[in-house]
């Protein structure tokens, strides 16, 4: 059985993330989507919320061989714990490769875990969590960029953010 891990901050999960996860689920017996907690980042959504939203989106997509969880440790440690031999990362044309290559080499050196890069769907490659939040902050419509359940959550989170600033 081949087990893969798709790590990310998923703040929020986007249509591009889901595309990579769904495509990965076709190639591997088991895929673990891992919300990686990064102490250097201040997320908009809680760890539990991000896990829940991804689960709901993947249930709707019918992905039966995908597990969603989180970790605040090294992804390689998580991989060892679940027996994963591959880390999956989606790549856009915006410099993702350069950013991800160094991490892939470290992961292979630390734990012998390979990284498989999947190119983003050209229709989705412009979408990132940062862009989604920026568009929403400025009143733009993010429908289609994120799962349907994220749209109202994003509006609520931004309303709370504005109230804190006032």
From Swiss-Prot:
Could you identify this protein by its name? Phosphopantetheine adenylyltransferase
Which residue positions hold the site described Transition state stabilizer? 17
Q: Tell me which cofactor or cofactors this protein depends on.
A: Mg(2+)
Gene that this sequence comes from: coaD
- Quote the cellular component terms of the Gene Ontology held in the record: cytoplasm
Q: Which organism is it from?
A: Bifidobacterium longum (strain NCC 2705)
Q: Which GO terms describe its biological process?
A: coenzyme A biosynthetic process
Which EC class does it fall in? Answer: transferase
Q: Which residues bind ATP?
A: 9-10, 17, 90-92, 100, 124-130
The answer, when asked if Transferase is one of the entry's keywords, is: yes
Query: Which Gene Ontology molecular function entries are recorded, alphabetically?
Result: ATP binding; pantetheine-phosphate adenylyltransferase activity
Entry similarity comment: Belongs to the bacterial CoaD family.
Q: Which domain of life is it from?
A: Bacteria
Q: Which reaction does it catalyse?
A: (R)-4'-phosphopantetheine + ATP + H(+) = 3'-dephospho-CoA + diphosphate
Binding of substrate occurs at 9, 41, 75, 89
Localization annotation: Cytoplasm
